[in-house]
Amino acid sequence: MNSVYSVPVEVKLALAFMVIDVFTGVLKAVKNKELNSTKAREGIYKKASFILFIAFGYLADYAMAYVHMGFNFPAAVTICTLVIVTEAISVLENLGQINPDLVKLVAPFLSALNKKEEGEHIEH
């Protein structure tokens, strides 16, 4: 049942990535003995700005649906995707600093993706 008050899946995913980023960030700070309130506040501000950015996207979608603006695109989904990608990169960076062995496991895959983007032939 889809309610007016239901949270769209893209928002749930963006929020989940934000939570995982906070958790891995705290783990990294504890491991490196760098836990401090200033950095935590900056992280909270960043997450709050992402949430406001997502809300802005839904407001823009609403405006495009009800006011003829001459253009239409899925602003909220685009913004959620941007947030998810940004948070995923941050999570991977945090995990790499928490456990450097993970970098060794993921590096060949990332290198192959990079080569594929550059149009190089990848041997299997």
What is the role of each PLM region?
Residues 1-8:
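Short, strongly hydrophobic alpha-helical membrane anchors
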Residues 13, 22-39:
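Membrane-interface helix-loop junction between the first two transmembrane segments
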Residues 14-24, 50-61, 79-90:
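Alpha-helical transmembrane segments of multi-pass membrane proteins
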Residues 27-31, 55-68:
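Membrane-helix exit/interface motif
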Residues 34-38, 65-72, 97-104:
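Membrane interface segments of multi-pass transport proteins and intramembrane proteases
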Residues 35-50:
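Juxtamembrane helix-capping/reentrant segments at transmembrane boundaries
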Residues 70-80:
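Hydrophobic alpha-helical transmembrane segments
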Residues 85-124:
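Membrane-proximal cytosolic segments adjacent to transmembrane helices
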